[in-house]
Amino acid sequence: GVVGCLAAFLASRIPGIQVELIDIDPAKAAIAEALGLPFALTRDAIRDADIVIHASGNPMGLQSALTLAAYEGTILEMSWYGSTLVPLPLGEEFHSKRLILKSSQVGGVSPARRARRSYADRMALALSLLADDRLDALITGESPFEELPELMVTLSTTPSGTPIGTLCHRIRY
């Protein structure tokens, strides 16, 4: 999804970092290519990662993340499961590799980091990071604001018609 693609895109801009966009859907390879990222299906992904960022919202994806992390690696969980129970094999690689599972609330900034920048500073930085034409690959549709009520029903019940479904549907105001 958009959160995972953005996280991978931003991480890839850090010198010396090896990033791989991983998905179960081979159609996501085109998105990865547009973002300049290497792509792998989960079964073919590079193992022994120091940090694995998981953002699929699928419990099986989180289970896979545990297998991709290196010894004493960190899995950063960015998914939101709501009230869904997520089964995890905590007795296998999680335990033997001494893995760290850390949650991230994408809607907020941790109190320890909040004072460093004001809301306006964080927003300006985020908007400047989004000002990259490659990120247009994440836009899978566009509609006028007036169509939003009908559009929400459509987007929540049917795929957008693209092979990868709806990633980010832009609303024109």
Q: Predicted segments — roles?
A:
Residues S56-S64:
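Beta-loop-alpha module in the N-terminal Rossmann-like domain of NAD(P)-dependent dehydrogenases
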Residues G1-T42:
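Mid-domain Rossmann-like dinucleotide-binding core that forms the NAD(H)/NADP(H) cofactor-binding site
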Residues Q63-S128, R170-Y173:
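Glycine-rich phosphate-binding loop and adjacent beta-alpha segment
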Residues D44-V52:
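A short acidic, Gly/Pro-enriched loop at the edge of an enzyme's catalytic core
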Residues D25-K28, P59, G82:
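Helix N-cap at the beta1-alpha1 junction of Rossmann-like dinucleotide-binding domains, i.e.
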Residues V52-I53, L76:
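N-terminal Rossmann-like NAD(P) cofactor-binding module of classical short-chain dehydrogenase/reductase
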Residues D23, H54, Q105:
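Conserved acidic E/D residue at the C-terminus of a beta-strand in Rossmann-like folds
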Residues R117-Y173:
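C-terminal hydrophobic helical "lid"/dimerization subdomain
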